[in-house]
Design a protein with these regions (language model features):
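Soluble non-cytosolic domains of exported or imported proteins
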Residues: 25, 61-62, 93-97
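Bacterial N-terminal signal peptides that target proteins for export
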Residues: 1-9
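Charged catalytic carboxylate motif
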Residues: 30, 66, 98-101
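Axial heme c-ligation environment in periplasmic c-type cytochrome domains
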Residues: 47-54, 73-101, 106-112
């Protein structure tokens, strides 16, 4: 019985990092497809169009709920923090899985 538990633990140790890496790659792809055109593929922002998300203090401190709200509902010009960027952020419709992936990347991998 103990041997079986050890084998199961070793298999899990080998499989789960690969699953996490694959999910991370999927999250990056979701970000690039959904956000990259305006915010840059690496989150660096585009002058006059959209702010940088990498290193962005609000993104780092915002709750997942706040990020989800902005991503799915957008932001009108008067609600924006960046007055030098005239275009409002559009609302985005997507699956919960895609939304969670983008938020995970915004809060994690993008900030590294």
């Amino acid at each position: 019985m103990r041997f079986e538990i050890r084998v199961a633990a070793m298999v899990a140790a080998l499989v789960f990092p690969a699953v996490a890496a694959a999910q991370s790659e999927k999250d990056i792809a979701y970000f690039k497809e959904t956000c990259g055109a305006c915010h840059g593929e690496n989150g660096e922002g585009m002058k006059g169009l959209a702010p940088a998300l990498k290193g962005n203090a609000w993104v780092k401190s915002a709750s997942e709920g706040d990020l989800a709200n902005v991503i799915t509902k957008g932001r009108a010009g008067d609600a924006k923090r960046h007055k030098d960027i005239p275009a409002p952020m559009p609302a985005n419709s997507m699956s919960d899985n895609r939304l969670k992936g983008i938020i995970a990347y915004l809060k994690g991998g993008l900030q590294k």
